[in-house]
Amino acid sequence: MLAYVFWHRPREGVASDAYEQAQLSFHRSLAHSRPTGLRRTALFEIDESPWALHVSDAVRAQAAPAYEDWYLLDDFTSLGILNEAAVGHGHRTAHDEAARRAGAGAGGLYALSEGSRSGSGELAAPLGDANVAIWVDRPLGASHTALGELLGDGMDPRNASLWRRQLVLGPAPEFCLLVRESSVFDEPAGVARTRLPDGWTATVTARRALWYG
């Protein structure tokens, strides 16, 4: 399973309510007529993207929230289909309404590394319930193979999933652990700061689900 993740925030002068409604309309459109290979989509409000969506001082002064989209896909072929379908017949109007209100944005592509799936291929831990994301990144030149296998230590696959970046499409971190927790103190041992090598970082972001379907 792959996940295309997109971080974005409103263009200067665009109200958050109007922006959210436009984004929700696009997600509803995809759910109504789902492209082949697209399993689920999710939209979250986040306080800030820790790898920085560069915005003007005016936008920052608005204290406008940032947003995080997840598009769960079967494979790379499904990613290509979504890319075409999003601006194709049936979705073009909703896509363009959302896009024209958007300001800064950045994307990343991740593959499921650890996490249970049902017989139908769905995640056992629903993406929409993951209200905490822990982003783990390494310094340039550092090896990650062995550590990547340990990040899931202590993770309950029924309530969490571990994702690993596939392509460098932007500033997104190397790994993402999604957990259904209300407190960062309950984070799995594998991503505890005391276990990470020097230079590695673990950034915790709280998320509020606006859409999952």
Residue ranges of model-derived segments:
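Macromolecular interaction modules
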Residues: 1-213
